[in-house]
C-alpha cells in the first residue's frame, strides 16, 4: 500500500516553488489559488524572504498550495492513482482532505485562510515559538515541560517531540536541556497546537460549519490519534480542534505500519516526513517530492517499479 503524506509548517524555504512555476500548468494553478485567497503565493513561493514566509498567515496557504501542485503532478492522464490512503501533518491535513475528496480545493482554501489568519492573530498576542527536542526519555521530558510551563505540540516519533510556549521559557529549556537531548529552535511564528491558539477556534468553527464536507473517497488518518476517519464532517471537526491539540504523528505512523504501508510519498515541500519515516517506518521506501523532477520517482513507486 502506497500512502501520500503532506507536510506542515516549517517545511517552506525561500524560493522553493521556483522550479514548479517554470511549468505553465503549475504556475496557472498557483495563480488561481492566489486569486482565491487574496495572497500572492507566486511571489511568496519564489522571491519572498525567510521572515516573510515564516508568517503563519502566509506559510499555511503556501504549504497547502505546494502540496496540491505536487499532487496534480502525481495524477496520471487516466486520473487513476495507485495509492492506498493519505495523511497530513498539521496544516498538511487540509491538503490531505482535498486529496481524499473531503473538501473541494475552494473550500479547503476558505478553511486554511481562516485557520492561518486566526492562528497568526493568536500568535501575536504573546511572544511564543516552538523547539524540537531530540532524544531523551519522553516521560522525563513531559515532566520537565510542566515545570517550565511549556507544552508538547507535536509527537513526531523516532525520539522527536516538538514543544511550544513563550520564547523566554523555550530559552530556559535550551539553556538547560535534559541529559541525552538536543533542543533545536524551529522557524515558526507561534506556539501552535497549544492553548495559546484558543482565540482562533471560534471563528474557525464558524467557517467549518459553513463548508460542505464529503465523506472520504480514500482512507485518511487523523493527527488526533492516528485513527482512520470515515466521516468528512468528523474530519473537518478534528481539524478545528487540532489547532489547540498536539499532533500525534507518532501514532499516525504506527497506524500506517499496521495498515501495511509499503511505500510513502511526501508532497512538496517535502523532506520532514520522509525523515521521520526513516526512523518511525524503518525499511519502508520513501519518495520526497521537492521539485517536478521528483515526480518520476513517485510514479515509479506507484507503478511498482
Residue ranges and their predicted role:
Residues 1-140, 186, 263-293:
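FabD-like malonyl-/acyl-CoA
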Residues 25, 62-66, 169, 203, ...:
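Charged catalytic carboxylate motif
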Residues 227, 246, 270-272:
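Short Gly/Pro-enriched loop/turn and capping motifs at secondary-structure junctions
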Residues 9-11, 37, 49, 100-244:
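Alpha/beta catalytic cores of group-transfer enzymes, especially the acyltransferase/condensing modules
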Residues 196, 295-301:
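Short, charged, surface-exposed secondary-structure boundary motifs
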Residues 257-260:
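Non-catalytic positions within long, well-ordered alpha-helices that form the structural scaffold/packing
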Residues 247-255:
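A short, well-structured juxtamembrane/interface segment
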Amino acid at each position: 500500500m502506497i500512502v501520500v503524506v503532506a507536510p506542515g509548517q516549517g517545511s517552506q524555504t525561500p524560493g522553493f516553488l521556483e522550479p514548479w512555476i517554470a511549468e505553465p500548468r503549475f504556475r496557472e494553478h498557483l495563480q488561481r489559488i492566489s486569486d482565491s485567497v487574496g495572497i500572492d503565493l507566486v511571489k511568496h513561493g519564489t522571491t519572498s524572504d525567510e521572515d516573510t514566509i515564516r508568517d503563519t498567515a502566509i506559510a499555511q496557504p503556501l504549504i497547502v498550495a505546494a502540496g496540491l501542485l505536487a499532487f496534480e503532478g502525481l495524477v496520471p492522464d487516466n486520473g487513476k492513482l495507485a495509492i492506498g490512503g493519505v495523511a497530513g501533518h498539521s496544516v498538511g491535513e487540509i491538503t490531505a482532505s482535498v486529496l481524499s475528496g473531503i473538501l473541494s480545493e475552494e473550500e479547503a482554501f476558505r478553511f486554511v485562510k481562516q485557520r492561518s489568519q486566526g492562528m497568526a492573530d493568536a500568535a501575536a498576542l504573546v511572544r511564543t515559538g516552538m523547539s524540537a527536542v531530540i532524544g531523551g526519555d519522553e516521560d522525563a521530558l513531559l515532566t520537565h515541560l510542566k515545570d517550565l510551563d511549556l507544552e508538547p505540540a507535536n509527537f513526531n516519533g523516532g525520539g522527536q517531540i516538538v514543544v511550544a510556549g513563550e520564547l523566554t521559557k523555550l530559552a530556559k529549556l535550551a539553556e538547560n536541556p535534559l541529559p541525552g537531548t538536543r533542543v533545536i529552535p524551529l522557524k515558526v511564528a507561534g506556539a501552535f497546537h497549544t492553548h495559546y491558539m484558543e482565540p482562533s477556534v471560534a471563528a474557525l468553527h464558524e467557517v467549518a460549519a459553513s463548508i460542505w464536507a464529503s465523506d472520504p473517497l480514500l482512507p485518511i488518518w487523523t493527527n488526533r490519534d492516528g485513527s482512520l476517519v470515515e466521516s468528512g464532517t468528523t474530519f473537518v471537526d478534528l481539524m478545528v480542534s487540532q489547532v489547540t491539540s498536539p499532533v500525534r504523528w507518532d501514532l499516525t505512523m504506527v497506524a500506517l505500519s499496521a495498515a501495511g504501508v509499503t511505500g510513502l510519498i511526501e508532497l512538496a515541500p517535502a523532506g520532514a516526513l520522509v525523515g521521520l519515516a526513516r526512523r518511525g517506518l524503518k525499511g519502508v521506501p520513501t519518495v520526497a517530492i521537492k521539485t517536478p523532477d521528483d515526480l518520476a520517482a513517485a510514479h515509479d513507486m506507484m507503478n511498482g517499479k
